[in-house]
């Protein structure tokens, strides 16, 4: 015979110390649903920010006439850093979308889709690798944007944002969104690490 407390049965003879908390099945279910919901939202945001970076970079072109007969054009591929960022953002965008779909299915079914230790490790490693690669690429692009705006006296590189203000403004927005995408990927990596830790403890 026992006393029913929520979904948990506590024997009458058992002692529960003051301040102790009994975790019920409903609480565990709610925690899982919340975590899966957060995982989906973070991954879909990572997808959206990476997509915004791609669109901004591809469409960031400005042509300026600096003198009669002299026309200059600024494009994202004038330097290597934005090109690398575009390639990496495209990879991250596709990966984030696939993971968002998997996360949404897990949320709907209330169980992990592709529930496998090898895949859990693969997700964890890919989250980590892509986060650091995206961070490095965003930092390199930020440096290129800074030099374009301020110049570099030591190597006699002149600032170019004077005649290309719109281009530089869009470039700055791209860098900002890139770092927001990095934050979203970092949170996703933390969640996948938590899932891997739970699996190592015998939880699904």
From Swiss-Prot:
What are the UniProt keywords, alphabetically?
A: Cell membrane, Glycoprotein, Membrane, Transmembrane, Transmembrane helix
Spell out where the chain is glycosylated.
Answer: 77
A GO CC annotation recorded here is: plasma membrane
Q: Which ranges does the record mark as transmembrane? A: 37-57, 85-105, 118-138, 171-191
For the Cytoplasmic compartment, the record's topological domain ranges are: 1-36, 106-117, 192-204
Keyword ATP-binding (UniProt) = no
- Predominant place of localization: membrane
| Membrane protein topology class | Multi-pass membrane protein
Q: Outline which residue ranges sit on the Extracellular face.
A: 58-84, 139-170
Q: What's the family?
A: Belongs to the Casparian strip membrane proteins (CASP) family.
Quaternary structure and partners: Homodimer and heterodimers.
Name it.
CASP-like protein 2U1
Q: Which organism is it from?
A: Selaginella moellendorffii (Spikemoss)
